[in-house]
Design a protein with these regions (language model features):
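Stable alpha-helical elements in mature extracytoplasmic
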Residues: 38, 61-65, 89, 113-117, ...
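Short, solvent-exposed loop/turn segments at secondary-structure junctions
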Residues: 49-50, 103, 134-135, 181, ...
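N-terminal secretory signal peptides that target proteins for export/translocation
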Residues: 1-3
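Extracellular ligand-binding/catalytic regions of CAZymes and related secreted enzymes
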Residues: 20-37, 61-67, 71, 212-214, ...
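Catalytic beta-strand/loop cores that center a nucleophilic Ser/Cys/Thr
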Residues: 22-29, 154-239
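Helical hinge/lid and interdomain linker segments adjacent to catalytic or ligand-binding clefts
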Residues: 24, 31, 44-45, 50-136
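Bacterial N-terminal signal peptides
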Residues: 6-16
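A glycine-rich, often tryptophan-bearing local segment used as a flexible ligand/cofactor-contacting loop or short
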Residues: 103-181
Length: 312
């Protein structure tokens, strides 16, 4: 075969890949209930479109978790947008994971859904909240989340922002199996949360230094130089587990192997499952980051810039 036919064949095979729509989410099967009650059901709730492209990619992030959880033995992951249309998929769930907007925008705040979630938590179902999903208004609901998860963000003392972060594991908790220190440049973070007491099941997992200029609350300013907790685990005294990681603002951060292990381990542990000795294995390729993205408008150009002078 000479070079021209080879080139034509190569282009023909490459065309479908080049034409793949990164916003096509039709390939993600939603609300597929478990066929076997012996499998550990983990329900992933993906929030709606938010922020700019490649940030707050809740659907795409949950789709990645869905794929990786399918690779774990004895697990049946179920994914839904916001909240299941068929609430039966929640029955028997070992863990509920929500990756989406916080600040009272969580889809389970609505009273009937809150009652359903509360019943699951009372029965020992695990809870995982990622990034700003930990942000709840002060009040009884926020107190409940703190008791389920081990921590909650309130604007009275909590701080948030974007900066380069060097993260390090602390302790020997099962969620840290296979997790090594890692950097997450430019990601978004929440810190200085209201945490449960350590003698009531709270365990810090990942800590790091934050810029002093990001300590925007009076309380946070009192602790300049302190390592801040960015991920934690919680063993509820009454039964059930919780895990949270406040990063994962930027979609590219899923490319960090230790972050993938941390989140996957946290989900498995919260579901009451044994975390593998080397942490949960995940198959990953850079192309995975360009799949199942939400359709979002590009950010508007910044105002205030001086117009470029035309050459005379």
């Amino acid at each position: 075969m000479n070079s021209l036919p080879r080139l034509i064949l190569f282009l023909a095979l490459s065309l479908p890949l080049c034409a793949a729509d990164p916003n096509d989410q039709s390939g993600v099967a939603l609300e597929v209930n478990s066929p076997d009650p012996k499998l550990a059901k983990i329900v992933l709730l993906a929030g709606g479109p938010s922020s700019k492209p490649m940030a707050h990619e809740y659907f795409a992030g949950c789709a990645l978790l869905l794929d990786w959880l399918k690779q774990q033995p004895g697990v049946w992951p179920v994914m839904a947008r916001d909240w299941p249309k068929d609430e039966q998929v929640l029955a028997g769930a070992k863990c509920v994971v929500y990756f989406g907007d916080g600040g009272g925008k969580q889809p389970f705040i609505e009273p009937s859904r809150w009652a359903r979630l509360s019943k699951l938590m009372a029965g020992g179902t695990g809870l995982v909240l990622l990034h700003q999903a930990v942000d709840f208004p002060k009040g009884p609901d926020g107190d409940k989340v703190k008791s389920w998860l081990g921590g909650v963000f309130h604007g009275d003392i909590g701080c948030r922002g974007h900066w380069d972060m060097d993260l390090k594991p602390v302790g020997t908790h099962p969620v840290l199996r296979g997790v090594k220190p890692f950097a997450a440049p430019g990601d978004g973070w929440l810190f200085n949360l209201h945490f449960a007491d350590k003698d009531k099941g709270f365990t810090p997992l990942i800590v790091g230094q934050v810029p002093d200029k990001s300590r925007t609350s009076a309380d946070a300013k009192k602790h300049a130089g302190r390592d801040e907790v960015m991920a934690w685990a919680h063993q509820r005294p009454e039964g059930g587990r919780g895990f949270s990681f406040t990063g994962v603002d930027l979609h590219k951060s899923w490319s960090y192997e230790s972050q993938r292990k941390l989140v996957m381990n946290g989900i498995l542990w919260s579901a009451g499952l044994e975390v593998p000795a080397d942490g949960a294995a995940t198959k990953f390729a850079e192309a995975d980051l360009n799949r199942n993205l939400d359709k979002k408008a590009a950010p508007a150009p910044k105002t205030g810039a001086k117009p470029t002078e035309k050459k005379k």
